[in-house]
Amino acid sequence: MKQFDVNEYMALVGRQARAASRGMARAGTAQKNRALLHLAAAIRRDAARLKDVNARDVERARANGQDAAFIDRLTLTDRAIETMAAGLEQIAALPDPIGEISNVKFRPTGIQVGQMRVPLGVIGIIYESRPNVTVDAAALCIKSGNATILRGGSEAIESNGALAALIEEGLADAGLPATAVQVVATPDRAAVGKLITMTEYVDVIVPRGGKSLIARLMEEARVPMIKHLDGICHVYIDVDADIDKAVRICDNAKTQRYAPCNTMETLLVAREVAARALTPLARIYQDKGVELRVCPDTRATLEAAGFSGLKDATEADWHTEYLAPILSIRTVDGVDAAIEHINTYGSAHTDSIVTENYSTGMRFLREVDSASVMINASTRFADGFEYGLGAEIGISNDKLHARGPVGLEGLTSLKYVVFGHGEIRT
């Protein structure tokens, strides 16, 4: 018996994806929507079987000592299954960006020049223990006219296999290429190494996972990536802030959820309002069990107000994405210092200012070099659904191609189209 060769297998997957991408680029909106709606119905129909298959993945993960948070991400509950199905219906209802022509201009020569939105081609998506990503990613790629290669975590291999079969069923029902969505069927990590170097077959890689995964892919990939490494998000309370508004925003930005990449990790406060802003906020944070790591000026302000249990912030804290109930706080001399801090220590993800001063707010928008910059809003709004994109495949803090939450348009590109009437260049 011939030994399994992961490189040969991945090359086959790549060739099949490239061939399927041509059919996907030609697919009409009704055809793509039919595949999504069939998949939604199939997921609801097979919910019990999906839970049984998923239970085996969960049992293995527990036996391997995975923690409760990991098990929670891996588990397909009734609610998670319904969320997947409903998400498919929402994506089907979104406008189809493919074929849209914009920016049409008449040139003095008589030609008309515009831009048409087209699929990227083949998208490789690498993710960890969430089976729902298999469906979400497949749906966005189908709707945007792309073929996709999905490589989920080995811990979810049976769940992903069951979902892959349903995706193939939906593609077949709509008359779309069967290999438009392929789920890598081997747990061999070498498959990831091959996927991220197949420039002849794969147009872009979208990684979704922890910092160690993203860092490894950044180092080894030859295929371009849409990604973000860190979510070191800031809120700056300006000298002209409405303090009640600032307290609400900063409470939500830190404590609504600790793990998402759009959670605030560093709070900056203008010196003139430090006592008024930090006293109520520190009370809220300590009541909720948030550890406060503070600069010397912040410590002096809070200790004068009777607070204890504070930790000294180190240089490393300003660079840290905690993803936990920990917050670093710095008192600054104003908006200049706040912008300087953010552009020095931030990760170009999401940053917000609380101010009633229009000029200061607009300056913050212009000068903070991040994918999302906000005035008087929680960083937790940095999300594709909240931005009206309907769904997102991830968030990018890069500057090329997609930036910020990546929805359907982020999985497309623009090509120039020219309409002539027999003109020739002289």
UniProtKB/Swiss-Prot annotation:
Belongs to the gamma-glutamyl phosphate reductase family. Keywords: Amino-acid biosynthesis, Cytoplasm, NADP, Oxidoreductase, Proline biosynthesis. It comes from Ralstonia nicotianae (strain ATCC BAA-1114 / GMI1000). The keyword Transferase does not apply. The gene is proA. It is found in: Cytoplasm. Pathway: Amino-acid biosynthesis; L-proline biosynthesis; L-glutamate 5-semialdehyde from L-glutamate: step 2/2. It catalyses: L-glutamate 5-semialdehyde + phosphate + NADP(+) = L-glutamyl 5-phosphate + NADPH + H(+). The lineage of its organism: Bacteria, Pseudomonadati, Pseudomonadota, Betaproteobacteria, Burkholderiales. Its EC number is 1.2.1.41. PROSITE patterns: PROA (PS01223). Catalyzes the NADPH-dependent reduction of L-glutamate 5-phosphate into L-glutamate 5-semialdehyde and phosphate. The product spontaneously undergoes cyclization to form 1-pyrroline-5-carboxylate. SUPFAM superfamilies: ALDH-like (SSF53720). GO terms for molecular function: glutamate-5-semialdehyde dehydrogenase activity; NADP binding. Pfam families: Aldedh (PF00171). This is Gamma-glutamyl phosphate reductase. It comes from the Bacteria. GO terms for biological process: L-proline biosynthetic process.
